[in-house]
């Protein structure tokens, strides 16, 4: 297979993988109130897809997943969001771990 065709096929597979991750993300969001375990399973599938295809999880999805127990985080349901000294601190209510994301203060 020529190099250009191989690259085109790889791009197609990566696009399909990203679309599937977004679809699973939406399903996890819908399933969380009724069935949290199924929601966690969808998050695990997102991680498996990204590892299998060696692509990173999109930032919008990654920020809604606990980095320790891989549960889907929803503010007010199973996560606590706080602003603390230039950081957004997200506390997972399932495992109790905290994730810190910096933000830029407006002058």
From Swiss-Prot:
Annotated cofactor note = Binds 1 zinc ion per subunit.
Gene Ontology biological process terms from the UniProt entry: tRNA 5'-leader removal
Q: Name one GO cellular component term.
A: cytoplasm
Q: What is its EC number?
A: 3.1.26.5
Q: Report whether Cytoplasm shows up as a keyword of the record.
A: yes
Q: Which reaction does it catalyse?
A: Endonucleolytic cleavage of RNA, removing 5'-extranucleotides from tRNA precursor
**Entries under Pfam families matching the protein:** Rpr2 (PF04032)
Question: What cofactor does this one take?
Answer: Zn(2+)
Q: Name one GO molecular function term.
A: ribonuclease P activity
Question: Which residues hold Zn(2+)?
Answer: 66, 69, 92, 95
User: Oligomeric state and partners?
Assistant: Consists of a catalytic RNA component and at least 4-5 protein subunits.
Function as written in the Swiss-Prot or TrEMBL entry: Part of ribonuclease P, a protein complex that generates mature tRNA molecules by cleaving their 5'-ends.
Protein name per Swiss-Prot or TrEMBL:
Ribonuclease P protein component 4
Q: Which gene encodes it?
A: rnp4
């Amino acid at each position: 297979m020529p190099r250009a065709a191989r690259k085109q096929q790889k791009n197609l597979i990566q696009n399909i993988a990203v679309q599937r991750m977004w679809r699973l993300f939406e399903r996890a969001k819908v399933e969380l109130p009724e069935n949290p375990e199924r929601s966690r399973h969808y998050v695990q599938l997102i991680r498996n897809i990204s590892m299998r295809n060696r692509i990173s999880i999109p930032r919008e999805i990654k920020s809604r997943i606990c980095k320790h127990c891989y549960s889907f985080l929803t503010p007010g349901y199973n996560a606590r969001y706080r602003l603390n000294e230039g950081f957004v601190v997200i506390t997972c209510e399932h495992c109790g771990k905290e994730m810190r994301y910096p933000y830029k203060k407006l002058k």
